[in-house]
Design a protein with these regions (language model features):
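Short, conserved micro-motifs enriched in small and acidic residues
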Residues: 4-8, 29, 149
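Mobile active-site "lid"/loop adjacent to the S-adenosyl-L-methionine
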Residues: 104-131, 138
């Protein structure tokens, strides 16, 4: 599988907490690009950093494993799990992260690619937005961040879901995600945005100021 622009954009744009002993999770790591970019950004700056990466596709896992093993940053090789994020969340309920990032599947109602690996990587029937949000909510620490990249249509859909869940949780003293940053990426200045880079924070929902 080739490196795609979405992964590089997210890996460069997302904010990493610059403190020792942080934990990060890459959901749907693919070839491991974003996890490796995260490792590079904190290498020689932080200590005790842990990076986990989850990937459901076996062939992609082989690529990621090779890339992780060749990473030049001692002690910062991501831990790879060949499973779905749904199963990972069920098997590892004690794991909590300061930062979760993902370049998830996004084609909802389109014909599948005959190439199975590309189909798994692109189609959301392997990971719906609802499942993604549920798993992220279970795995984030309070105050933790979730960074994600999606095409415009799917990005706007995710923002609507997050806003609905946030408003529904106000006054209930439960942690939910709320949007903190959104970057709309255009291929040229005059064109409509093609990608949404989004960052959410996991905290108790409170009334927003007008």
């Amino acid at each position: 599988m080739r490196v795609n622009t979405d992964a590089v954009l997210l890996g460069a744009w997302m904010e990493i907490p610059m403190q020792d002993n942080i934990s990060m999770l890459d959901i749907g790591t693919g070839t491991g690009v974003i996890a490796l970019m995260a490792a590079q950004r904190v290498s020689n700056k932080l200590s005790g950093v842990k990076i986990d990466a989850v990937e459901i596709d076996k062939d992609a896992c082989k690529d990621a494993e090779l890339n992780f093993s060749n990473a030049p940053w001692d002690g910062l090789h991501p831990n790879l799990y060949n499973t779905s994020i749904q199963d990972f969340t069920e098997w590892e309920p004690q794991k909590k992260y300061d930062l979760i990032f993902s370049n998830p599947p996004y084609f909802i109602d389109s014909l599948k690619n005959p190439n199975q690996a590309k189909s798994v990587a692109r189609h959301s029937d392997t990971l719906s937005q609802g499942d993604l949000l549920l798993c992220v909510g279970k795995l984030l620490k309070p105050g933790g961040k979730f960074a994600v990249v999606l095409p415009k249509t799917e990005g706007e859909e995710l923002l609507r879901k997050i806003d609905f869940l946030f408003n529904s949780a106000i006054g209930k003293q439960i942690c939910v995600l709320s949007a903190k940053r959104v970057c709309k990426v255009k291929t040229t200045e005059r064109k409509e945005p093609k990608r949404y880079l989004m960052e959410f924070e996991y905290n108790v929902a409170t009334e927003r100021e007008n």
